[in-house]
Regions:
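Pyridoxal 5′-phosphate
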Residues: 1-170
Length: 170
């Protein structure tokens, strides 16, 4: 489909939702079933991610840890590698670009580090899908969320996510 080409993920399935918030909630709730999980997020996540994770934190189902950035808002890859060694990630959720600071995450590099630890990787591209290229077709990315009404220039009410066919949501 054209959307798969635009997101550079021809082998992934597309699931449509009314909003990116709903897409993120479906993914997060589906991934956090079962035993307690360790979830890493960036310091720049949207409330759609942080509020949902906070709810699961209160239930004792998740430990939420933040990826380290330095004083210049750059991701410290060596420090993140150490973080992952100390506390193995089950899930990594990261905004492709912050809706506040505009900081673009090194998605490819961070997803490889997370996958080396066996984590499921979720990329929130609500601000960037169709605007800033991201190779969401990589095997290291399990889910990529998009908002149709933002930089895809579609109508309101068309959002969703691309997912690997082997991705497992409960």
């Amino acid at each position: 489909s054209r959307l798969q080409k635009l997101l550079n993920c021809p082998a992934k399935q597309i699931v449509f939702t009314p909003t990116a918030t709903i897409a993120l909630n479906i993914i997060i709730q589906g991934l956090l079933q079962g035993e307690r999980k360790t979830v890493y997020i960036t310091p720049f996540e949207h409330n759609a991610v942080t509020r949902t994770l906070h709810h699961f934190e209160l239930l004792g189902k998740v430990a939420v840890l933040q990826l380290n950035v330095d004083g210049h808002l750059r991701y410290d890859i060596d420090e993140i590698r150490q973080q992952f060694s100390k506390n193995k990630p089950d899930v990594l959720i990261m905004s492709h670009a912050s809706n506040v600071f505009g900081l673009v995450a090194p998605v490819e590099e961070l997803s490889v580090l997370a996958k080396q630890q066996g984590a499921t990787v979720v990329i929130d591209m609500a601000q960037t899908a169709g605007l800033i290229p991201c190779n969401t077709g990589l095997e290291t990315i399990d889910f990529a969320v998009f908002a149709g009404h933002k930089t895809l220039y579609g109508p309101t009410g068309i959002s969703g996510f691309a997912m690997k066919p082997t991705a497992n949501l409960h």
